[in-house]
Amino acid sequence: MTIEDLVLDLEQHVEIKADIGDVFKSVLHRFGEGSTQPDGSTMNMILEQWPGGRWFRDRGNGVGHLWGHVQVIKAPVLLELSGPMFMSYPAINHIEIKLDQIAGGTKLSLRHRAMGLLDAGHKQGIGTGWKHYLDSIQKDLS
């Protein structure tokens, strides 16, 4: 096992033709109740929108999965989440979503960093999953 096997550092960016405040609201929606899988089915996610707030999947009937906690929320420019996410093994994740007002709209930057005993399949598919999130946010505002 090498250090590369134990770490993940992924960045994705999208420019959205919408006001930064509207983009931030869509980010909160898509990371919470509006979270979907690529096939359109709901993820049943809850995002408590305050520092220390939980970010979790509520499957109903007392079944759920803690994905993380809100580390930083600074509307309309920054959301940081940290925790195990979907990884049910020894790993820690940090998600940083930054928004910058640009000419004609907003630049949304997502950075996902993780370390631990990372599953190779998770590392391979994570870019596709985050692209779905960013595409969904862009679609919300088009």
Language model regions located:
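Solvent-exposed alpha-helix faces
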Residues: 28-29, 135
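Hydrophobic-ligand binding "helix-grip"
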Residues: 45-46, 56, 60-103, 113-116
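A conserved amphipathic terminal alpha-helix motif
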Residues: 114-142
